[in-house]
Amino acid sequence: MASSLFFRRFCCLHSATSPSSSSSSVFSKKKPLVFLGSPQVSTTVLDALFNASFAADAAFEVAAIVTQPPSRRDRGRKMMPSPVAQYALDKGFSSDLILTPEKAGEDKFLSTLKALQPELCITAAYGNILPTKFLNIPALGTVNIHPSLLPLYRGAAPVQRALQDGVKETGVSLAFTVRALDAGPVIAFEKFEVDEQIKAPDLLALLFLEGSKLLIRELPSILDGSAEKKAQPQDESKATKAPKIAPDEAWLSFDQEAYVLHNKVRAFAGWPGTRAKVVVADEKSGCHNILEFKIITTRVGIQETQADEICFVKDALLFPCGGRTALEVLEVQLPGKKVVSAGAFWNGMQGKRLKKFDETKHFSHVSV
């Protein structure tokens, strides 16, 4: 999905990058750089670094990659390398130079890193805390791509928490790493306006794409040391946190207003997703059961409603919500099934009535 579909860029760098002496000088030796990243979005940054390092006048080379150890993924539960490790291997990068410590403070790993004598480390969603012993190794420090406008949304889930809050503006920051979480001086940033329908996986991918461009643009100043001088300290009085998402946060409560639920669906898309319970009433048999499913895609309804009845209007399931608002649900997913449209789900109900689930009442539990 093209970034122009979701974003209107209206502010670029923290300070415009001017041609530095390093860009015109001739490097007798490429400076070793170590990249740290793990999920699929990190491969965008690694790809940008690979491409830049292959240029004839490149000032650096990717000397090693640090990533999470292999883990069991997908339905087969086979041990698989991280997406970053797999991407590097597919590009022909030496497996001996792909380091996978359980923790970044392991003595053996730190000894290996020291032997590489990196000038700079770059992190992009690595997933491990970097101890002081690590941060002291690279001569020029460690620089992180963080998908928020620091000091806003420091922590593990900046994109998700920003969408959950319904922000109209977000961005990506390039900052030096210090011991305190996401608190280092900011080298540069870019701001974007956020579309009201974009979901976390798409926003995350787009921010890391823009972050990779920002990194390549700023690398000359980082490598010649001028970035450290221009980097701006963060305003601690404006700092906010973006804590890791817990699985039990996935449940939706329709007592909340529709816009709150819509933002949560967008924020938790991918993982952990958003779940709901409804009462299925079969008038023929007189049975009332509880049905659980995931809500995949929504929009805020334009009509007010007070009823507890869930109905189907045009292309959406209409859920009554708090404050006389309504949430239009466009896609759902039943347990073990594929994502389906609201229309297909409604047809599958075969005339049964759907009502909001009330925790104060007791019904037998089913998952259809």
Give each language-model segment a name.
Residues 296-336, 343-344:
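Low-complexity, glycine/alanine/valine/leucine- and proline-rich hydrophobic stretches
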Residues 176-178, 277-290, 320-323:
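Short acidic, glycine-rich loop/turn motifs
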Residues 61-63, 184, 291, 296, ...:
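A short, local hydrophobic-aromatic micro-motif
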Residues 175, 253, 277, 294-296, ...:
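Residues in well-ordered beta-strands of folded domains
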Residues 250-252, 274-276, 308, 315-317:
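Residue-level detector of beta-strand structural context in well-folded domains
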Residues 2-272, 325, 334-336, 344-368:
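One-carbon transfer enzymes
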Residues 85-89, 282, 313:
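Charge-rich, low-complexity intrinsically disordered and helical linker regions
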